[in-house]
């Protein structure tokens, strides 16, 4: 009995060893080309130094600060919105001429409508433009205020056309400083040091235009698309029930006409 069990015992040991050896050899020989990084015994291969790398994110090429200003052609008068770096837009809060201008956040000024949009008009001097409010039709200007300082406001465009000239000065990030030639000052949105006096608007002041190297974050304005209601491109279908069908009289009915 012992002699008969010995071959069976030896075979039971050798068969798993042989099967394991065959499978291991097959795994080492077969490299799946769809697997990345490439399969090697020592792990993933090191990238070649000649392999081109991905470009690192960063600022693009600097824009010239004295670049040409896009002046609209006479008669075009494109409508735009003027947005500062705080995300609020330059807005007329009152339709009366002479009222101060503020910068309101878009979500808080939806009811203002076209009071937030401005038409760009050619100025009376080279490289200057004028801003005419789309809703009211008065033009933006600056003048000494009643309580001191200089006020940013609007007035009828026919009163001294040269007083409405603004000079857009391009910055390196594609925005503009807006300099009023009537006072020689630039529009500043005081959102970094804002007070709780108005939680929905940013105070606008006219101050000396920053020179090269000075902080100008609050002086930068983006000349963007006008703010208008968005319309759906696809109308939602209106589902209505079918009208009731007429009931035909039953030929076996005893009541009513046949």
UniProtKB/Swiss-Prot annotation:
Stretches for region Mediates binding to target cells: 93-104
Covalent lipid sites (N-palmitoyl cysteine): 22
Domain Ricin B-type lectin intervals: 125-223
Leader sequence residues: 1-21
Biased composition (Basic and acidic residues): 249-258
Pro residues: compositionally biased ranges: 46-62
Superkingdom: Bacteria
Example of a GO cellular component annotation carried by this entry: cell outer membrane
SUPFAM superfamilies, per database record: Ricin B-like lectins (SSF50370)
Key words of the record: Cell outer membrane, Lectin, Lipoprotein, Membrane, Palmitate, Signal, Toxin, Virulence
Disordered as annotated region, ranges: 40-71, 236-258
Keyword Nucleus set for record: no
GO MF term list: carbohydrate binding; toxin activity
Compartment(s) of residence: Cell outer membrane
Membrane topology: Lipid-anchor
Lipidation (S-diacylglycerol cysteine): 22
Function: CDTs are cytotoxins which induce host cell distension, growth arrest in G2/M phase, nucleus swelling, and chromatin fragmentation in HeLa cells. CdtA, along with CdtC, probably forms a heterodimeric subunit required for the delivery of CdtB.
Assembly description: Heterotrimer of 3 subunits, CdtA, CdtB and CdtC.
Additional free-text comment from the UniProt record: The operon of the strain O128:H- / 9142-88 / EPEC is referred to as cdt type II (CDT-II).
Official protein name in the record: Cytolethal distending toxin subunit A
Lineage: Bacteria, Pseudomonadati, Pseudomonadota, Gammaproteobacteria, Enterobacterales
